[in-house]
Amino acid sequence: MSSTLLEQTRSNHEEVERLERLVVEDLQKEPPSSKDRLVQGHRVRHMIESIMLTTEKLVETYEDKDGAWDDEIAALGGQTATGTNVFSEFYDRLKEIREYHKRHPSGRLVDANEDYEARLKEEPIIAFSGEEGNGRYLDLHDMYNQYINSKFGERVEYSAYLDVFSQPEKIPRKLKLSRQYMKYMEALLEYLVYFFQRTEPLQDLDRILSKVCSDFEEQYADGIVEGLDNELIPSQHTVIDLDYYSTVEELVDVGPEKLKEALGALGLKVGGTPQQRAERLFLTKHTPLEKLDKKHFARPPHNGKQNGDAKSTHESENAKEIALTEAKVKKLCNLLDETIERTKQNIVKKQSLTYEEMEGEREGEEANTELESDDEDGLIYNPLKLPIGWDGKPIPYWLYKLHGLGQEFKCEICGNYSYWGRRAFERHFKEWRHQHGMRCLGIPNTKNFNEITSIEEAKELWKRIQERQGVNKWRPELEEEYEDREGNIYNKKTYSDLQRQGLI
């Protein structure tokens, strides 16, 4: 309502204090899921940005570059051009307030607490692609396509690209000094920065990259930047030493690529057959470059030194810019190391799944996300009826399919108990429940009865085993009984042996 500078300053201080308390209150709450944690981070980030903007206004007010603050203090003291009159200043401000309410008679009083409470319930919109999985994985498919379709890249699988994209030092230096490579590195850096800002909203990325730039400048000044040589134009004596070659034929054996590099270093034409290249290079053995015919040069040798110096300076600047971009990319890759590793594992896992399994996995992840966001006293959201793991959450869908946990096996011997998955079914034959059921049937729990779950089948098999072993056959030498004078009972075989020995 009041437009005085003093009131605006007081209001700004109050807003900063309220926002600071809101940040503390929000951070004291433990988010139930990773998605909620991400939303909380962006919400706090927005409040911190509001604090910074308001603080900048306060700094400008206290700097008082336009003298408005001194004028405000003087006005509060009633100092005017005609003298000091405190009451006149008071009534002028009172009149201003009354006129404001006359112009806005139905103005609604806005409760500051309601506005700040609404900030705590704010849910910022965070855009992620389907491949990024709410910030769990990187989506580098665009960068991958640029890499495999470029001169500096190789035709590798996407999973292999995830191993090499963070190692630009492995790319030959001569392939980096191209506009294509520069555009690729800039696009890669732009994506990593954007992804980092979305997944780590509370990190001060500007300070991190500023530190990378300062460290790079120090290393560049000392000449220790990895993969960067300050001398971009190679010397003619370091490419091919012509003193070792007496004929053109010997020079041809060096190879067309080395001949091309040597000619390019000297500013000569690099085209033609290997024989023509060797002849052109061999001319420089006994003839200085200044005396060579102009037709041998790729560009006119006129003012060649100045052009060469300008080209060298331009290439040096490009190489420095590329090296700085590489340093930023490597720093971000170090910060996102866990995400990169998680992306590799996800890609390898997807390669072993069918489309239906991937869809089921995606639905399972969505179910788990909603489960995490439920209140502690809420019901477990498990639409796919997945088994509950050790952490109280449904297991991943791919693990569910791997172990065949959708197959039900019932065992009548165990009291019609259900076993889910082939592995659990095979293991239960040695467990206490099945062993107890076999003892109740009077049947030994041997390997012969594995895969037998019906009581009738178990009894029939036991009967056949007994018949095969001759258990039910009459054996008089073992089952016929004899009694001696003292009333001792023996079977026929034992009684006959004792009688032959004269003991009975």
UniProtKB/Swiss-Prot annotation:
GO terms for molecular function: RNA binding; zinc ion binding. Pfam families: SDE2_2C (PF13297), SF3A3 (PF16837), SF3a60_bindingd (PF12108), SF3a60_Prp9_C (PF11931). Its main location: nucleus. The lineage of its organism: Eukaryota, Viridiplantae, Streptophyta, Embryophyta, Tracheophyta. GO terms for cellular component: spliceosomal complex. One of its GO terms (biological process) is regulation of embryo sac egg cell differentiation. This is Splicing factor SF3a60 homolog. Belongs to the SF3A3 family. Residues 293-319, 355-374 are annotated as: Disordered. It is found in: Nucleus. The modification Phosphoserine is found at residue 373. A zinc finger (Matrin-type) spans 409-440. Keywords: Acetylation, Metal-binding, mRNA processing, mRNA splicing, Nucleus, Phosphoprotein, Spliceosome, Zinc, Zinc-finger. It comes from Arabidopsis thaliana. InterPro entries: Matrin/U1-C_Znf_C2H2, RNA_Proc_DNA_Dmg_Regulator, SDE2/SF3A3_SAP, SF3A3_dom, SF3a60/Prp9_C, SF3a60_bindingd. Splicing factor homolog to SF3a60 that may be involved in pre-spliceosome formation. Is necessary for gametic cell fate determination. The modification N-acetylserine is found at residue 2.
